Amino acid sequence: METNYLKRCFGNRLAQALAEVAMVQPSDPIEYLAHWLYHYRKTAKAKEKDRQEKIQLQREYENSLKETRMAEMLKQEERAIQEQCEKCHYQLGRRNSAVGTHPHPVPLISVASSLEKTKFMQENTEAFEKEPLKQESLPGTSDMIPGMPQQSPSSEPSVSSQVDLNTGTPQEINYQAIQHEIALEIHPGSESPP
């Protein structure tokens, strides 16, 4: 059992240690051998730790390169879309000036910020769609919240009601989310589960 442990921990280095003990011929060979093996084990662990850290640093470096490339691609895509929008607005302006109508100028919005807003609103509405509102009422009070559409807690929302949730404009979806937050502030005991 001891030989298996030594072979597993030190491998061929044990033979090297015994050869060194034979060459040096210290006064206490067992103590010398123990010191040599302890030192070898300590340096082997340090080398393994350094190797693992280098691997981790290499992974982090590769991930940061990927993120940098993705950010650059998104910037290029945003620039291309912005240029397309400017080109379309320019052509629309030329067409309108040829016809004689002058519409109000439309401000150009950053595509990235509008995409982020849309993604944020979609994530918020998905959370509302996945978890139906569960409201607790105090004894003697009504379960109705003024100005909020009510659902029966025992019935599943129908497919048509789910479709209605998805067909609203971002402003309507945002308005519904704000209404829900206001309702929770008005009735603090009726919080939905996280």
UniProtKB/Swiss-Prot annotation:
Segments of this protein annotated with the region Disordered: 126-172
Family annotation (Gene3D superfamilies): cAMP-dependent protein kinase regulatory subunit, dimerization-anchoring domain
Coiled-coil zones: none
Superkingdom of the organism of origin: Eukaryota
InterPro entries listed in its UniProt record: Dpy-30_motif, DYDC-like_DD, Sdc1/DPY30
One Pfam match: Dpy-30
Biased composition (Low complexity): 149-163
One GO CC term, this protein: Set1C/COMPASS complex
Family of the protein in this entry: Belongs to the dpy-30 family.
Protein name (database record): DPY30 domain-containing protein 2
Species annotation: Bos taurus (Bovine)
